[in-house]
Amino acid sequence: MRAAAISMPRLNKMPGMFFSASPKDSKEPSHSLLDDNKQKKRPKTFGMDMKAYLRSMIPHLESGMKSSKSKDILSAEEVMQWSQSLEKLLANQMGQNVFGKFLKSEFSEENIEFWLACEDYKKTETDLLHNKAEHIYKAFVHSDAVKQINIDFHTRESTAKKIKTPTPTCFDEAQKVIYALMEKDSYPRFLKSNIYLNLLNDLQANTLK
């Protein structure tokens, strides 16, 4: 009489607590996950790269806009001097920050960001000029720029030609146009703004205490 065959379960396929899948089975899901992760990764966009570049290029502007301690390192006399000229305002780092905050409220912060980028560019070492000039041009001057500045066609075209053989002065023409625009348009409004007047009044009140 033939003994009945006993069917034994395949342990490596059981979902039990003590046995895991075979090495071959355990490796396959990991490859699948890796493939899924690769598919989910998206290439960095130029816009994101440019934002990172702008933050690294003028970090004090962004940090200053968010700072709540400006009153601790400013005097009323210093802030009053900002009303003498745009030049005096921009010569002061905290002045740049406060003016930048005002421009941001008017959605025109690209003007001071470009001006600061040009100031930084002039201090650039010769072997780095080409790379930095290209970044500034693409960020502010190009017709599809992330933060396109308001300059005339001639200045835009002239700047485009100059960056092909970059020098420390290749953005000077465009920078002067933006400076004149801020001086004539934004700066007078800034001096009448709550951002400036409240800061000045608070500092003057603290002086009298």
From Swiss-Prot:
Expressed in multiple tissues. Disulfide bonds: none annotated. One of its GO terms (cellular component) is cytosol. Residues 24-38 have a biased composition (Basic and acidic residues). One of its GO terms (biological process) is positive regulation of GTPase activity. The keyword Zinc-finger does not apply. Interacts with GNAI1 and GNAQ. This is Regulator of G-protein signaling 1. Regulates G protein-coupled receptor signaling cascades, including signaling downstream of the N-formylpeptide chemoattractant receptors and leukotriene receptors. Inhibits B cell chemotaxis toward CXCL12. Inhibits signal transduction by increasing the GTPase activity of G protein alpha subunits, thereby driving them into their inactive GDP-bound form. Residues 18-42 are annotated as: Disordered. InterPro entries: RGS (IPR016137), RGS_sf (IPR036305), RGS_subdom1/3 (IPR024066), RGS_subdomain_2 (IPR044926). Signal peptide: none annotated.
